[in-house]
A protein has these predicted regions:
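Catalytic cores of the polymerase beta-like nucleotidyltransferase superfamily
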Residues: 1-330
Length: 330
């Protein structure tokens, strides 16, 4: 059984003081405040989170009146950010989400929900554990701790419903598989492919952000394999990929602990695309996936290196000099 006091004491001191201050201010008004989401999950895993989100029974306007520096981060969804020194803490009012028709966000939200109702709208059991820093209560109605101990990613309730609400959630499941080295529970996994028509509705910018988190994780190999296997890449570009690429080249990506993003992208594109017109197709994908000009330049440079490695024996002296001058110029 988890020792809640030790869990709270494991929070780095600068964050702990801030979080306890916020929680006490809210509790003194007779309201509720809980630490929730990825920070609680990571604390249970023995990690040191750098971001902390809270949920509360207070309304956004009440929070704005209580705290001196508050930013209206997403006030239409009940979220504001409390600033304490240089630290920022997102705090969201308990809410119920009413209907999802665009596969991206709720059509309507209702405040006045209970903590229990609020947790039911969240994505995965491991992210729906609430920690009260004042009373040292740990609320886990969806068996998230058990799933964390089993290293399982499982949706709250029916995965088709959860993924149907927000098309980013299937990609987040794959991302967590890479970043946490967890396994996706079978029913949840099967729903990833079944809800591709919902995932297709999310913006390319949101996909870009999740792909970056996979690429820069400790184990990008498994996440990239799953994105390809579930045909997620194809939802955001019309470029044709290898139908069955070899995994050998991609496996080495996981060994590049400090590789820059451009090199990681080059490994991905070199794996996904046939060698014919590789650079042209790669540039189009990077544009479709909303990568910056700098990221694109880096990735294409590394891809050019890969191509020259493939055809090195066939290069004549003029081609070799051209390539070397390109490397020097870069």
């Amino acid at each position: 059984m988890l020792n809640v006091t030790k869990l709270i004491d494991s929070i780095p001191l600068n964050f702990k003081k801030d979080l306890e201050f916020i929680s006490k201010q809210i509790h003194d008004l007779g309201k509720e405040s809980f630490l929730i989401g990825g920070s609680v999950r990571d604390l249970i895993l023995g990690k040191k989170p750098h971001e902390y989100d809270l949920t509360t029974s207070m309304l956004p306007e009440e929070i704005k009146k209580k705290f001196k520096r508050v930013i209206e981060t997403g006030i239409q969804h009940g979220t504001v950010t409390i600033m304490l020194g240089d630290n920022a803490y997102e705090i969201t009012t308990y809410r119920k989400d009413i209907d999802y028709t665009d596969g991206r966000r709720p059509d309507k939200i209702e405040f006045g929900a209970s903590l229990s109702e609020d947790m039911k709208r969240r994505d995965f059991t491991m992210n729906a554990i609430a920690l009260d820093l004042i009373t040292e209560r740990l609320i886990d109605e969806n068996h998230g701790i058990e799933d964390i101990e089993k290293r399982l990613i499982r949706t709250i309730g029916n995965p088709l419903d959860r993924f149907g609400e927000d098309g980013l959630r299937p990609i987040r499941a794959i991302r967590f598989q890479s970043t946490l080295d967890f396994t996706i529970e079978p029913e949840t996994y099967n729903a990833i492919y079944q809800t591709r028509h919902i995932t297709e509705k999310i913006s390319r910018e949101r996909f870009h952000d999740e792909l970056n988190k996979v690429l820069t994780s400790n184990n990008p190999f498994i996440g990239l394999i799953e994105l390809h296997k579930n045909k997620i890449f194809e939802l955001f570009t019309k470029v044709n990929f290898h139908s069955n690429p070899s995994d050998v080249d991609l496996q080495s990506l996981g060994k590049l602990a400090v590789a820059p993003l451009g090199l990681r992208l080059a490994y991905l594109l070199n794996w996904l695309l046939p060698k014919k017109d590789l650079l042209i197709q790669a540039e189009q994908i990077l544009k479709d996936f909303r990568y910056s000009k700098a990221n694109t330049k880096d990735a294409l440079f590394y891809l050019d290196l890969f191509l020259c490695n493939y055809k090195a024996e066939a290069m004549n002296s003029i081609e070799t000099r051209k390539f070397l001058s390109k490397v020097v110029a870069y």
